[in-house]
Amino acid sequence: MNINDLKLTLSKAGQEHLLRFWNELEEAQQVELYAELQAMNFEELNFFFQKAIEGFNQSSHQKNVDARMEPVPREVLGSATRDQDQLQAWESEGLFQISQNKVAVLLLAGGQGTRLGVAYPKGMYDVGLPSRKTLFQIQAERILKLQQVAEKYYGNKCIIPWYIMTSGRTMESTKEFFTKHKYFGLKKENVIFFQQGMLPAMSFDGKIILEEKNKVSMAPDGNGGLYRALAAQNIVEDMEQRGIWSIHVYCVDNILVKVADPRFIGFCIQKGADCGAKVVEKTNPTEPVGVVCRVDGVYQVVEYSEISLATAQKRSSDGRLLFNAGNIANHFFTVPFLRDVVNVYEPQLQHHVAQKKIPYVDTQGQLIKPDKPNGIKMEKFVFDIFQFAKKFVVYEVLREDEFSPLKNADSQNGKDNPTTARHALMSLHHCWVLNAGGHFIDENGSRLPAIPRSATNGKSETITADVNHNLKDANDVPIQCEISPLISYAGEGLESYVADKEFHAPLIIDENGVHELVKNGI
């Protein structure tokens, strides 16, 4: 260890306080801190901080974003409800791309389940389905099934590679989990793990914060750290070598995610897009979700906190909210576009500033847990690159079919928790059974009514999930039903299992057959 060189480097960068407790540390602690500091580029970090603060101050003083916002124009919008005559063509195109081994999925899985009350990665969480499957297993099985669907459709054996971005905190436990479960039936060589970067937390005056005498306070660099990680770990090269063209990017916490959704892929391909966003219709003006729109003619996501209530409440002539394209972190990119992002555009992206309450050691070495923000964490967002797309498109889907995020613990009595996620999936699977000709009966043998949901265009539609059930207690859900992804990717192929048959709930349909569960066991 050349401590004098390190001291000089830190002094030049104005970060010499990081060695304040050096002489108090044991040798092993010194080695640990030395290695951590040696790995940092302080000149770059100071530049990041300066640009992030400039951007933060500029946006704080910038004139209201409202006047510069335009909604997504209809010509770049595809809709699962309003373009039903084109859905089959988009699906066929997407399945063709999959059959040609040109589609991969990229999972953003850096988050721990801290808000869920667990210390392991979110993807390992079990929301309490009858099968006890975790989010990782559900998504892996959807990939397996979709490969089979594409193969059956076009006759070609195919592979959908799965790229999984973890963080420093989740990498090892995620890899161990996949190894333990034999990659859920996927081939190990087609599941590629890589790690997003970390950045130190900094005080408002640009000083790196120590969380212990020998440890810097570090945090992941946001889901937009994806692009730097793609470059650093040669992931784009791997995609190019495999002949991949289309990438579907999504977050781990959405239990309803249609991994490598052929309709979404096909829509983007047929539109000639290099970048696309899947959205759900925002129906409540105050719903805390960002909206995809144009600002000064450039596509981006505007966070709900940046939009005035008056603008959020604006409606178009058909009664829908004017700014209704709710962002769900579900995106399409072409590999050539990602190559351009990695080589050209990523360095142009500014970090966003998140003011945080960051525990730190004071000059006496005492751990302080502040009760108000005392510093910043810097992060980039995955959607920051929309602005660079040559052809950007938006695909709108039904929330009850495709979006139920897992953010909070049940104990927080809100939404987006294990109960709402579980109910959303079971409500959807209930609908699949009804649409395939199955029926549910109560304890007296009477058929339970199935009420089709009216489509927005006024025509009768297939039965869709009732999102009102998603917030109720598990015991209040009228129908508990789970269908393994290995049996059906999106409700297809269920007729042979359920048509003209009657079932008691809870019902499970999996590779071992059809099971009606009772309260005290099977």
Swiss-Prot record:
UDP-N-acetyl-alpha-D-glucosamine 1 binds at L108, G110, G111, Q196, G222, N223, C251, V252, G290, E303, Y304, N327, F381, K407. InterPro entries: Nucleotide-diphossugar_trans (IPR029044), UDP-sugar_pyrophosphorylase (IPR039741), UDPGP_fam (IPR002618). Belongs to the UDPGP type 1 family. GO terms for biological process: antiviral innate immune response; positive regulation of type I interferon production; UDP-N-acetylglucosamine biosynthetic process. One of its GO terms (molecular function) is UDP-N-acetylglucosamine diphosphorylase activity. It comes from the Eukaryota. It catalyses: N-acetyl-alpha-D-galactosamine 1-phosphate + UTP + H(+) = UDP-N-acetyl-alpha-D-galactosamine + diphosphate; N-acetyl-alpha-D-glucosamine 1-phosphate + UTP + H(+) = UDP-N-acetyl-alpha-D-glucosamine + diphosphate; 5-diphospho-1D-myo-inositol 1,2,3,4,6-pentakisphosphate + O-phospho-L-seryl-[protein] = O-diphospho-L-seryl-[protein] + 1D-myo-inositol hexakisphosphate. It comes from Homo sapiens (Human). It is found in: Cytoplasm, Cytosol. It is an enzyme of class 2 (transferase). UDP-N-acetyl-alpha-D-galactosamine 1 binds at L108, G110, G111, Q196, G222, N223, C251, V252, G290, E303, Y304, N327, K407. This is UDP-N-acetylhexosamine pyrophosphorylase. Keywords: Cytoplasm, Immunity, Innate immunity, Nucleotidyltransferase, Transferase. Monomer and homodimer. PANTHER family: UDP- GLUCOSE PYROPHOSPHORYLASE, UDP-N-ACETYLHEXOSAMINE PYROPHOSPHORYLASE.
